[in-house]
Amino acid sequence: MMGPPPGMFPGDKNKNAIPKPKSVKEIPSYLKTLLSGFFGRLFYIFGIVWNTAPWIMIAMSAIALVQGLLPIVSLHVSSAVLNALQSAYSMAQQGAPIEGFLKILPWKAIVAIVEGNTDAVLLASLVLSFVLLTFVIRVISNVVNLLQNAVTRIGGELVVRQVKVMIMEKAKVLDLASFDLPEFYEKLENANREAGHRPIQILSSTFSVITTVIQLIAYVVTLVTIPKMWAAALVIMVLAIPTAIVNFYYRRKNFEYIRRRSKDRRQMNYYSDLMVNKDLVKEVRMFHLSDTFIDRYQSTFDKYFAGLRKLIWRENIGYLIINVITNCAYLFFFAIIAYNVFAGQMMIGDYSLYTNSLMSVSSCIAALISISASIYEGTLFIDNLIAFINEKQTVVPVLPEPSEQCPAPAPAKVNHGTAHTIVFEHVSFCYPGSTRRVLDDISVTIRPGETLVLVGLNGAGKTTLIKLLTRLYDPTEGRILLDGRDLREYDVEDLYKMFGIIFQDFGKYAVSVSENIAFGDIYLDADPEKIREAATQSNADDFINKLPNGYDTALMRYFEQDGIELSIGQWQKLAIARAFYSESDVLILDEPTASLDPIAEQEIFNQFDRLRADKTTIFVSHRLSSATVATKILVMEYGRVIEEGDHRTLMNKKGRYHELFTTQAKRYLAEHEGENAPEFPPHPQHPPRFTTKNPE
């Protein structure tokens, strides 16, 4: 479910955001747009709740109606009790008998009094009837409140699930490039933060407004039945206008302040998380960083809190001034009603009815202002969710123009189960927000069944090239062809099935061992034998068999108290097992053995060489011993391919590959013999390449 377009609402951080009015003439247009934005957000939330479970909306509507009517009914009944009690008491004081009133049925007493029979016995019976009715109303009110609590809590959990799923579904299809931008993380953090409570809170508040409006109308109708009391209701409502202005003004100020200081909040969360992150706690303790992070948290909080405190004080001073004026008005009108009682123009029950109605009008207006302002503030925060849901996805299939032969073109499908030809044609790439070319004019052909090894120092662009091949990014310039067709023309999800990949920062999942391996190909039914075979091929079987529950052992302690924490080398073997488990056409391994010793690494590479069959295999590795099994080696420097060929060809060429290989060989020997290992030298002929604009 998509939200309104970005920039629809004032306050959006979008170039299309609606500007504030610069003159009086622009105010009506601004207010119109403001209201349309407010109701746009509100109906967006209603849509979420309705899609979650329609019964939530229906139940809350019925509850709002009943809660709106019960207080005024209760107030009229209480007034009637007091008036009847006063009349019965007066008649009893004059000697009228009241014995036997318990024998009169309530509805008979009501009928008799309506017909004009007002003896003391009937009045006493009427008092009892109203007391019983008050009890019934109270029971109904309690039941309705319990129902409201149940509906809000149950509905709230369902709505949280719905919004969280919306966020996860959106994150599933968003471009990887989005995750490289701080602005994206701000949207993601804000959306996640508000997802837990804002939608159901706004819905509940909206129905509270409906309840309050019903009550307000009933109280005003009660007041206008008395001459001149309509003026009291009008004055109270007029006095509410300054309260509304202050409330809405500071709600928006609060929202704008929180959004403006979102960086401070992220920093506070970051520093507090550092203190409890299980992966960092050892280093934080050993380097005595605890006090540093606590000081930075407190310093950031002080900056954040200083502005927030000023807003809170200013808001409450405004409320104080308005409340003093409003209470003076109450005092005046209460005195008028009391005078009418002393003058015999009203009964005691009438005093209770009208003073409570007057107070209730004020309370309803205050509640309307407060709840409406809360809804307004909540809908502003919902902008965070809308902005995230509206995040543009650019990695989508590029379809040809419709034609008579193909009026509705569909994305191309990959021919799975075969070897593929992959061609990079003058591919260049810059990360979003940067002008530096991470890849610069790459032209390479990967033939079916080849074993390709990418070598080069850190920052050469090896991993970025893999991300473009798997279409996690699209090239800034040039194109990539798969079997003669532009990679962008393929269905993205179908394309992903073609690759079995281990990233350098591979996943460590808090599930069982077997699930960690089976995640390598979720389209296959989990096969215990195939899982064991993959673990054996990655040399993970040895340590798995020693675990308490073998392949069913829970890993990590996020959810299970007895979860097992593996070493980084063991995790890497599980990641490699995932690649062996996959039935993908192209295997890609980005530094797959970085945490393994050279002997274990060579065993893994030999396994891949034996088991890959006719699959195309691409390795990224710093250890050049793996390159000896390759049919093609690409040597990369600063985003360019500077050498290409097999191991023998490149060694005979005595270029950069020869230099890196021999340096690494000497390093291994030096480490073995206990000498100082030589460093990899930078290549003097290939300095960093930048574009002419804004070099980084």
Regions found by a protein language model. Give the residues of each.
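Membrane-integrated ABC transporters
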Residues: 1-71, 88-129, 148-152, 169, ...
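Short intracellular "coupling" helices and adjacent cytoplasmic loop segments at the cytosolic face
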Residues: 21-30, 166-197, 261-296, 387-401, ...
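An intracellular "coupling" helix at the cytosolic face of ABC transporter transmembrane type-1 domains
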Residues: 51, 190-202, 256, 260-263, ...
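Transmembrane helix-loop-helix hairpins at lipid-water interfaces of multipass membrane proteins
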Residues: 57-147, 216-251, 328-335, 339-349, ...
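Cytosolic ends of transmembrane helices, especially the final helix of ABC transmembrane type-1 domains
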Residues: 289, 313, 333, 354, ...
